[in-house]
């Protein structure tokens, strides 16, 4: 009986999805980290940023991983120019006049911390069938600048 219980315990632990935190360092020393990389649909993950250039506004979102050299799109929540919701964020310490109050300012040292909701579908795209990630990219004021792009792939479990 003990062997059977031990076998059941080993099997149940081995079948549990592994969900570790992950981080990535960008070319300019910025660090992006996420609390979990394997989640269930509708889960919320914590995303931290450190050492980001406070003169460059960024978007933080859950997006389809793009082809090399392209901006991440589509993204859950779209490009958040309304400053509302938990699917995407516009982070900028020096937003244009029309965006004052819509952006979240960097904390000292180019830091930020946000909760991002993960959805299986981004529009009609199924993130169980294509690769999706927590992403950071330069905001629309530098829309062609790919030097700030960072991606941490996220798996949506069944």
Label the model's feature ranges.
Residues 4-13:
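Sec-dependent N-terminal signal peptides
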Residues 22-158:
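Extended, solvent-exposed regions of the mature portions of secreted/cell-surface glycoproteins
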């Amino acid at each position: 009986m003990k062997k059977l219980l031990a076998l059941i315990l080993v099997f149940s632990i081995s079948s549990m999805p592994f969900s570790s935190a992950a981080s990535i360092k960008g070319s300019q020393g910025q660090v992006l980290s996420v609390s979990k990389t394997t989640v269930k649909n509708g889960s919320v993950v914590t995303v931290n940023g450190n050492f980001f250039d406070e003169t460059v506004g960024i978007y933080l979102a859950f997006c389809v991983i793009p082809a090399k050299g392209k901006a991440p799109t589509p993204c859950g929540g779209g490009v958040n120019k309304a400053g509302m919701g938990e699917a995407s964020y516009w982070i900028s310490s020096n937003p244009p006049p029309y965006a004052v109050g819509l952006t979240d300012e960097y904390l000292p040292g180019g830091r930020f911390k946000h909760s991002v909701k993960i959805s299986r579908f981004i529009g009609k795209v199924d993130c169980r069938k294509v690769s999706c990630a927590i992403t950071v990219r330069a905001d629309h004021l530098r829309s062609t600048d790919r030097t700030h792009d960072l991606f941490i792939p996220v798996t949506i479990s069944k």
